[in-house]
């Protein structure tokens, strides 16, 4: 509730009386009247921990609190009618994640679709939350939209980005780092910024792209949304595949003609807390890496399958790139560079060191063959 105050009108109390037989009516009336006055002075508490995204109707519904109250009520927010009541039970002392002693409430049997809040017998309450079969739809769309906000090398337009719109960034990606043994410029614009910095890392893309494509491959009917308000929305292609393709196009730029894949494109130092379009300075392409190449081969092989029915030309491009990367791994049976990737002197951006590339090679083989 916005103000933290619950408005339970007197007619609601009278309505509740209908659930009580006449013999107990007076007792129940005064009990509900007391409850009514308690709710007038109830406040929303940060100590009542719910799933604010909501709960699916037929799945477990648990909340936690650090308040040692006796009981809890689940109240429908639009009517202030009590829909469920039960006792709290002890959950854990000194919870390792929070350091708190926690109590839990279980209202899994409440399956009616609606908006509710938890009210504790001590007067604390939760924020409002929904029970609905679509509670995860919004979570999915916002999660997917997060990748759009990470796009590098392009304008984020206000109709799509809202208050997060900004000019194009990092048009100069990138220059070969001296450690590559090469010199000059190689176009590696595009892709997604990584986490909290503006670097772009192939091995990090492996888990992200691989997971997103696996989700679509496993449950295509669950990821066919084409209305996430990204520039490609409405083109008949699931937005998930459109967004992943933006990253795949960058990854293709990171492959050398010999099939090997460069490890990352970053500055030597992490940038400060600035907008991406204000991040100037040279961004370097770092050495060929067998862990990057293995991830790349696996991603491209999986992409070739999923995009085949959408764009056969792009699908074939992905498959050819995956095959070329695999051939590089065969020609280089031990880890490249020797001992695994290490940042060169003067570079402190993400290293993601790995001295064993057997898992990347296995994944690549599984996707290709």
Predicted segment positions?
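Well-ordered alpha-helical scaffold segments within catalytic/enzyme domains
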Residues: 63, 120, 209-232, 247-254, ...
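Glycine- and aromatic-rich loop/turn segments at beta-sheet edges
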Residues: 162, 180-195, 221-227, 254-282, ...
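Aromatic- and glycine-enriched glycan-recognition loops and surfaces
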Residues: 105-110, 193-203, 229-249, 281-291, ...
